[in-house]
Each structure stands twice: as C-alpha cells, then as structure tokens.
Amino acid sequence: MIVAGIGCRKGTSTADIEAVIAAALEQAGFAQDRLGAIATPADKGEESGIAAVALLYGLPLLFVLQPDLEAAAARCESRSDRVLALKGVPSVAEAAALAAGGPDAKLVLSRITLGPATCALAETDSSP
C-alpha cells in the first residue's frame, strides 16, 4: 500500500492538494489506485482541502499525532530547518507518510512541493 503524506499552508485548496498528490504519483510511476491512504499531522485536521481529496478518492484520512511524527523523523530524507523549528520534524509530508505507514514503511518518493502543498509517498505492507 502507498501512503501519501501531506503538508500544506493553512487554507490550501482541494485543487492544490489533488495536484500535488497527482504529481507525486506521476513522479513515482504509480497509478492512483495504488494509493491506500492519505496522512497528515493531526494539527491539519481543520484543513478542508485535505479532507475533500480523501473523500474524493475514497481513501482513509489518517491524522498523525506529534509523537508519532517525531518518531518517524529519523527516517525522513528531506530537511527544512524552518519546518524543523516550527513543527519539530525535518519534513511534515515525509514524517506523516512514514508514521502512518508504520515502522517498516519506506519512502518511495521524497517530499515534493507544488505551490502551497507538499507530498511524500511511503510504501508499506500494512493496511490503514
């Protein structure tokens, strides 16, 4: 299963979230039907754009708690000093994808940025 980890600025639109996921899947060479879940930090729970895309795709939306993001931080490949200072992890999208995928999840696409949103893809044998 592929988990899309999402980071975004406050108020990011559904179209922007959908676009960054589509770009990530294309870069990784995956069809949309390989996507099994969308993950984002729990503090993004009010972001309607992320929820709308999960609903549109018929996928579970997994809200990752801060301790779980931090536990996955060592497995992140990208690093933003600004994000680290603000969020406590080097990459929100990567940490969310890895944490939601579980301890055996592996990044198959490091964080990409498209406008106000970021997406990273992790692969896992687990189901959400």
What are these regions (language model features)?
Residues M1-G36, T40-A42, A122-P128:
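Conserved mixed alpha/beta catalytic, RNA-binding, or beta-rich assembly cores of soluble enzyme
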Residues I2-A4, G36-A37, L62, A105-V108, ...:
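Structural motif
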Residues E18, A22, A51, A93-A99:
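Predominant activation on well-ordered alpha-helical scaffold segments within soluble catalytic domains
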Residues A22, E26, F30, T40, ...:
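Generic secondary-structure signature for well-ordered alpha-helical cores
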Residues P41, E47-V92:
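Long, charge-dense
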